[in-house]
Amino acid sequence: MTQISFTDPAQVCLVADFYHGNPVDLEKLSRSNWNDIKCPGIIMKCTQGAGYVDPAYHGRAAQAGGLGFLVAAYHFGTAEQVSTQANNFLTHAQPTATTGLWLDFEDNKSQMGLSQAVDFMDAVDQATGRTCGVYSGNTLKSAIIHATSSQRDFLAAHAFWLADYALAPVMVDVNHKQLPWDVPFLHQFTGDGNGPLPHSLDGLQNGADLSLFRGSPEQLAAAWPLPKVAS
């Protein structure tokens, strides 16, 4: 099976993401590495739709911060009213100045549209004064072909976390047109046991969701939580 491999493992790092259904030992994870590649960042599900709150988020976020992780929260978007979803997310994420904020834009039974995704991210931007990143894969690659130029410009100004279970990220839409980004901020290369190794880390069971940041842990820390909104 293929695996990620780098000549200088100090110049890349991993970011793990999970929700309450994923068993995780944060103390073990804080000490883990894979072939000398460290995992300094974690992104945890916080909310979904207009009212759901992940029951593990608050406890894990507090523990992770105490262990020195870079911490981020994500909201799983649905077709419900955007303003209500943004309020649900910000109320329960309770972001500090160092909490990363992300929208999970992917297929589900109550599908969020691209316009709603942009509106959600903008609402988070305006409420926090910094940018909300977007996580997606084929959902965005399909939706983006109908985007307006202003929507593409908006997305290009926000960090992209790509789900693409492969060694190298493919940065084109379903029509093979370049996405608004040249490279992703994060590349989720494995999940649910699919994609290149590693599929687990100490403290995270096999089938973990892991993403690659092409930069050192220090560079990831400097870029975290994400840039402020341009004035």
Regions found by a protein language model. Give the residues of each.
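Functionally critical loop-and-helix segments that line ligand-binding/catalytic clefts
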Residues: M1-D36, Q151-S231
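Structural recognition of the beta-strand scaffold that forms the well-ordered cores
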Residues: C13-D17, P40-K45, L70-H75, T99-F105, ...
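Alpha-helical scaffolding within the catalytic cores
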Residues: Y19-N33, Y52-Q63, E80-Q94, V118, ...
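Conserved, mostly hydrophobic/aromatic
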Residues: L29, A64, L103, V124, ...
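Cell-envelope and extracellular/periplasmic
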Residues: M44-A50, L67, A79-S83, F105-D107, ...
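Sec-exported extracytoplasmic/periplasmic mature domains
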Residues: A62-L70, T91-P95, D122-R130
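Catalytic domains of cell-wall/extracellular-matrix polysaccharide-remodeling enzymes
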Residues: G100-H176
